[in-house]
Amino acid sequence: MQFNISDIIKILPHSYPFLLVDRVIECDPSKSIKAIKNVTFNEPFFIGHFPNHPIMPGVLIVESLAQASAICILGKGSKSTMENKVVYLMSIENAKFRKPVTPGDTLILQADFKNARLSVCKFECFAYVGEEKVAEATILAMLQNI
């Protein structure tokens, strides 16, 4: 399954400037997802992080991975079954940042579903620029009614 930005804004509750997934290139719901965040110099966080040396904040890379994970969960259901659902980030474990992400990079977001208990899902997540791993984290997220 693939999703363009029009699909993504129907799935996620986020909006600019906090929508950090631009496209889904592969999604096997509840198994794995591969998505893209195009990093541009126009991102509002580059104004202060850092002037004259722009680097995407690590917490926003993790947020991108969490949003991709949420799409993996929410994208599996029909519009009617997921309409009143939201995915909340519960925890981030073992986050590692290996290389800076800068304007012009295409951030490839990979989230692999590991298991679920009740409404809590665990994902092993990786971010790449090209073939190079730039970040990784284990994410726990909870599906809730709103």
From Swiss-Prot:
The enzyme's E.C. designation: 4.2.1.59
Active site (catalytic residues): 49
BP GO terms, sorted: fatty acid biosynthetic process; lipid A biosynthetic process
Subcellular location per the Swiss-Prot or TrEMBL entry: Cytoplasm
Alphabetized SUPFAM superfamilies for the sequence: Thioesterase/thiol ester dehydrase-isomerase
Pfam family, one: FabA
Domain of life: Bacteria
Listed GO MF terms: (3R)-hydroxyacyl-[acyl-carrier-protein] dehydratase activity
Reactions performed catalytically: a (3R)-hydroxyacyl-[ACP] = a (2E)-enoyl-[ACP] + H2O
Enzyme class: lyase
Alphabetical list of CDD domains matching this protein: FabZ
Keywords, comma-separated and alphabetical: Cytoplasm, Lipid A biosynthesis, Lipid biosynthesis, Lipid metabolism, Lyase
Gene3D superfamilies linked: Hotdog Thioesterase
Listed GO CC annotations: cytoplasm; membrane
Similarity comment: Belongs to the thioester dehydratase family. FabZ subfamily.
Function field: Involved in unsaturated fatty acids biosynthesis. Catalyzes the dehydration of short chain beta-hydroxyacyl-ACPs and long chain saturated and unsaturated beta-hydroxyacyl-ACPs.
NCBIfam families: fabZ (TIGR01750), PRK00006.1 (NF000582)
Protein's recorded name: 3-hydroxyacyl-[acyl-carrier-protein] dehydratase FabZ
